């Protein structure tokens, strides 16, 4: 980053007030606490516009540094067919659009608000995030899964919740909890099977909780929706990098 900063100012001009370290801290603080740019400017002694510029500059540099990892998890090229994978969807609140058509697309009936869905695929052995996909809040979890996994080998095994009923038709080795019906209650073996799947799947839900320690994901997203995917993908890269 220091090299990029020197290159940015190689033609001279006024030197930046912040060091590379402080710029990085400001960027991480923005993701972690989701301060306004005005608040960040006051904390670091710069104006609001410069706080915005430095965060966008830092985001661009980090996305270049993590380019290969970003490609791996967005294209799902590191999914190992010999391992089991856990899949889950979390929703992040976004601002309501003035356009009624867009409102309907992003409205989540489950959350009763406008959201973007993030699908996380985690390797059960390595605990790393190996796949990520996004869609509007109105899209069903299983539809998001089908749309994002069209290029994957059908021999891959996924563990999913009851929202993914029918996944075995696409990935035959996959498992979902058994459902009871009015005339077919669950046997003791079925209950033990469901408990086993839940105990394994809890790991991916813990990952979602860890990602949402970044308040930019847990609070309503205030920026343009076009920037959301890169931001969320970078946070997943941070998680993988720290393992």
Where do the protein language model's features map onto the residues?
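Basic, low-complexity segments
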Residues: 1-17, 114, 184
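Short, well-ordered secondary-structure "scaffold" segments embedded in the functional core
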Residues: 18-20, 34-243
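Short amphipathic helical patch at the helix-1/turn junction of helix-turn-helix
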Residues: 30-32
């Amino acid at each position: 980053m220091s090299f990029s900063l020197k290159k940015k100012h190689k033609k001279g001009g006024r030197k930046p007030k912040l060091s590379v370290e402080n710029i990085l801290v400001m960027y991480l603080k923005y993701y972690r606490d989701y301060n306004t740019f005005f608040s960040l400017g006051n904390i670091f002694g710069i104006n609001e516009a410069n706080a915005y510029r430095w965060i966008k500059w830092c985001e661009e540099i980090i996305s270049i540094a993590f380019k290969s990892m970003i490609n791996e998890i967005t294209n799902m090229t590191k999914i190992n067919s010999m391992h089991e994978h856990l899949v889950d969807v979390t929703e992040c609140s976004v601002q309501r659009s003035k356009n009624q058509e867009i409102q309907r697309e992003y409205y989540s009936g489950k959350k009763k608000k406008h959201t973007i869905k993030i699908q996380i695929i985690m390797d059960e052995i390595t605990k790393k995030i190996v796949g990520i996909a996004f869609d509007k809040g109105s899209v069903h979890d299983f539809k998001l899964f089908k749309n994002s996994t069209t290029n994957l080998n059908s021999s891959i095994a996924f563990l999913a919740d009851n929202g993914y009923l029918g996944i075995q038709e696409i990935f035959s080795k996959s498992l979902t909890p058994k459902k009871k019906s009015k005339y077919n209650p669950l046997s003791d073996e079925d209950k033990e099977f469901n408990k086993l799947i839940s105990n394994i799947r809890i790991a991916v839900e813990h990952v979602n909780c860890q990602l949402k320690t970044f308040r930019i994901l847990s609070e309503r997203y205030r920026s343009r929706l076009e920037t959301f995917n890169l931001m969320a993908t970078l946070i997943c890269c941070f998680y993988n990098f720290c393992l």
